[in-house]
Design a protein with these regions (language model features):
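Intrinsic low-complexity, intrinsically disordered or marginally ordered coil/linker segments
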Residues: 1-188
């Protein structure tokens, strides 16, 4: 079974292009609940090509949920298989002349990141560890939730097993709090 990668994208564009995108997405979703090889192409309004879905779209499937926010904006989110649908977002931005700001996360495979594009051009493509991503997104709220989780039941054998990208983002005080929570969980 696939690890699900959660994708969230804020999309802006002209009313006409968003109307066309929305229509094509609705048609593709009538056939099945997930976008697959053929339906990715249907949403893009392009003929089916040869290729491997991971390379062409970023993921094998995408359970796309669309919510229109205004005439010129909306949110597209949902799970995909193993990896983000960044390349699909880039293609959407190119076909429909959209500006897309997206985030993705997958705790099981330990990554999260940001991917932005406009009119087919990538402006941001940053991937980091899952804990680092969550800390950057939520700062102290995530940190203290993690501390409570560690104190209750830590699956790490030693503090050295923790994510070094995440640890590097912490202040010295936070590092000390993390060590104390870890030691408490291990009764050290």
């Amino acid at each position: 079974m696939a690890n699900n990668c959660y994708n969230w994208a804020s999309i802006e564009g002209s009313k006409e292009m968003l109307d066309l995108f929305e229509l094509r997405l609705e048609e593709a979703n009538k056939e099945q609940s997930h976008l697959w090889w053929e339906t990715y192409f249907a949403v893009l309004g392009k003929p089916i090509e040869e290729g491997i879905s991971y390379e062409v779209f970023g993921s094998r499937w995408f359970h796309a949920d669309w919510e229109r926010q205004s005439e010129t904006s909306g949110v597209l989110n949902g799970d995909s298989a193993w990896s983000p649908v960044s390349e699909f977002f880039r293609k959407l931005s190119e076909v429909y002349q959209l500006e897309i700001e997206s985030e993705y996360e997958e705790c099981g495979s330990d990554f999260g990141g940001w991917y932005n594009c406009k009119n087919g051009e990538v402006s941001k493509d940053v991937c980091t560890s899952y804990h680092a991503f969550r800390f950057i997104q939520e700062d102290t709220e995530f940190f203290y939730t993690l501390l409570a989780d560690i104190e209750d039941d830590s699956s790490w054998e030693s503090i050295d097993d923790m994510d070094s990208e995440f640890i590097a983002l912490l202040s010295e005080t936070q590092k000390q709090e993390l060590i104390e929570a870890f030691n408490k969980s291990k009764n050290i």
